């Protein structure tokens, strides 16, 4: 028996050594979590429900200084040393510009239906307006054509943080009313050029982040705020930028509906980020704080789009610092979506912070809330790599249900959802992402509950297919379900990718 045990130990040690030397792609069978769909399957969702992945041009394309692309505000923003960890850039990132076929093939192999990508404005119009860059047009035609060939439905987003630098230098971009016509012209060109194949459009991704992170705290390009080196005014500029973003969205939708929608037979919407804000307690003050947070976060954009006006709470607090819509603008903005994308990752507790600051200092200060991440010593959820990302599955149910009940149950797509690992994990560590599998399984289960209760959600997009350039975090954060070796750019599907493959190929509930 002792000889048998010794031989068994030796065999197990040899097997373990072999597995450690194998490419990660050969080791997926080791993780039983891949095969636990938790009762989820395609048939568990309404007929026609779409599963896809999402990404943005700046984060995945590369070729930032090639192919005729003009610089964006992000190219200028990250030039300052220390802005991005290790002074990283998106000049190459994961090079989807050249590797798009490989990436689309991965999507197809994993069973996904669609890819939500973004078009780089400055790759089409290097100066924001005027001369078209045909190389850029050709690239997007190749990408779209290959998706269609492989049966991957293209969901095109027109703007994901990357304003052409020329427009910022000319008139400060989103702070000028001139931007509205410029964006509408760019959108018009895209509808005309790609709309014969693209039937699902979004105007903006997370315009709240554009306004708040770009003009309130300067954390994102163009880095403006009160006290920022780039200048700015945190009490007014976020609201002005948001106002022009909303008008630009509505102007683009107007062009689409008047000129293209009837014969192209597509639909158009907007992508809004939404953290769920849970009252810290049942007190009226904490409940009011949570509602203010929802108004200042989601309502800032969805109230005008649904009702043609800003939330009453914002009008009361911001007062004359809040821009106003003319009657004509209000009519143009109201009902300017066929569907709405909700990007959801996490949830926070909200509590009343006490006396109001009577002197406005910033958009964030106008919320007048206190953030909390634990209650009675219990964290709201486990923390992912990003400091802001707590894993709170029930929050997605509450967020979607809130949109259903507050805004008349519009047609929704859960357009981003995911979690990150540290950027420095090895390939072997990175591909075995059990925590991410559990994140997706639990969040999608909660989403399904909201759908079963009547929420009109017609699709779900995981963020993201690939590890990529994660804005201010650079390459220190990995959101992908496919690991990318940034030295070789080789792709390694993670366990979570194979979990999706198993779940999406399931014919019935487990």
UniProtKB/Swiss-Prot annotation:
UniProt-annotated catalytic positions: 206, 416
Top class in the EC scheme: hydrolase
Entry-linked Gene3D superfamilies: Glycosidases
Glycosylated position list: 87, 127, 233, 424
Keyword Disulfide bond: yes
Keywords: Disulfide bond, Glycoprotein, Glycosidase, Hydrolase, Signal
Catalytic activity reported: Hydrolysis of terminal, non-reducing beta-D-glucosyl residues with release of beta-D-glucose
Signal sequence annotation: 1-27
UniProt: a beta-D-glucoside binding residues: 59, 160, 205-206, 345, 416, 463, 470-471, 479
SUPFAM superfamilies documented for this protein: (Trans)glycosidases
Entry's EC annotation: 3.2.1.21
Molecular-function annotations in GO: beta-D-fucosidase activity; beta-galactosidase activity; beta-glucosidase activity; beta-L-arabinosidase activity; beta-mannosidase activity; cellobiose glucosidase activity; glucan exo-1,3-beta-glucosidase activity
Disulfide bridges in this chain: 225-228
GO-annotated biological processes: carbohydrate metabolic process
Coiled coil: none
Function, as annotated: Hydrolyzes p-nitrophenyl beta-D-glucoside, p-nitrophenyl beta-D-mannoside, p-nitrophenyl beta-D-galactoside, p-nitrophenyl beta-D-xyloside, p-nitrophenyl beta-D-fucoside, p-nitrophenyl beta-L-arabinoside, cello-oligosaccharides, laminari-oligosaccharides and sophorose.
Family from the record: Belongs to the glycosyl hydrolase 1 family.
Protein name as annotated: Beta-glucosidase 26
Native organism: Oryza sativa subsp. japonica (Rice)
């Amino acid at each position: 028996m002792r000889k048998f045990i010794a031989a068994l130990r030796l065999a197990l040690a040899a097997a373990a050594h072999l597995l450690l030397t194998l490419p990660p792609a050969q080791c997926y069978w080791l993780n039983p979590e891949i095969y636990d769909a938790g009762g989820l399957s395609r048939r568990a969702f309404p007929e026609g429900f779409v599963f896809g992945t999402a990404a943005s041009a700046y984060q995945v394309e590369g070729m930032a200084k090639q192919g005729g692309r003009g610089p964006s505000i992000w190219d200028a923003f990250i030039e300052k040393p220390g802005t991005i960890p290790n002074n990283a850039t998106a000049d190459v990132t994961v090079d989807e510009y050249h590797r798009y076929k490989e990436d689309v093939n991965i999507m197809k192999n994993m069973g996904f239906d669609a890819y939500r990508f973004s078009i780089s404005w400055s790759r089409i119009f290097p100066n924001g307006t005027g001369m078209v860059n045909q190389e850029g047009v050709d690239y997007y035609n190749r990408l779209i054509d290959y998706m269609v060939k492989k049966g991957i439905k293209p969901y095109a987003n027109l703007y994901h943080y990357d304003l052409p630098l020329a427009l910022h230098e000319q008139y400060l971009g989103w702070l000028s009313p001139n931007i509205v016509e410029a964006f509408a012209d760019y959108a018009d060109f895209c509808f005309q050029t790609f709309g014969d194949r693209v039937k699902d459009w979004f105007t903006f991704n997370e315009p709240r982040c554009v306004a708040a992170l770009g003009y309130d705290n300067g954390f994102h390009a163009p880095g403006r705020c009160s006290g920022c080196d780039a200048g700015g005014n945190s009490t007014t500029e976020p609201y002005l930028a948001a106002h022009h973003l909303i008008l630009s969205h509505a102007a683009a939708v107007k062009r689409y509906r008047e000129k293209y929608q009837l014969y192209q037979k597509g639909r158009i919407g907007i992508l809004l980020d939404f953290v769920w804000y849970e009252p810290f307690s049942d007190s009226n003050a904490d409940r009011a704080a949570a509602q203010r947070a929802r108004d200042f976060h989601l309502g800032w954009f969805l109230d005008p789009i649904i009702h043609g006006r800003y939330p009453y709470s914002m009008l009361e607090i911001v007062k004359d610092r809040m821009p106003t819509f003319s009657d004509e603008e209000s009519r143009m903005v109201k009902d300017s979506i066929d569907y709405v994308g909700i990007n959801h990752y996490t949830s926070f507790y909200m509590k009343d912070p006490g006396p109001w600051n009577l002197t406005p200092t910033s958009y964030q200060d106008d919320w007048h809330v206190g953030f909390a991440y634990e209650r009675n010593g219990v964290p709201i959820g486990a923390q992912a790599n990003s400091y802001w990302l707590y894993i709170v599955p029930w929050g997605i149910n509450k967020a979607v249900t809130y949109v259903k009940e507050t805004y008349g149950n519009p047609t929704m797509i859960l357009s981003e959802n995911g979690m990150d690992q540290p950027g420095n994990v090895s390939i072997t560590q990175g591909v075995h992402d059990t925590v991410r599998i559990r994140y997706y399984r639990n969040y999608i289960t909660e989403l399904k509950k909201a759908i079963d209760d009547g929420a009109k959600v017609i699709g779900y997009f995981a963020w993201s297919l690939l590890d990529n350039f994660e804005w201010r975090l650079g390459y220190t954060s990995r959101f992908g379900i496919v690991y990318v070796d940034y030295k070789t750019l080789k792709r390694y599907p993670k366990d979570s990718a194979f979990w999706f493959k198993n779940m999406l190929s399931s014919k019935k509930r487990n």
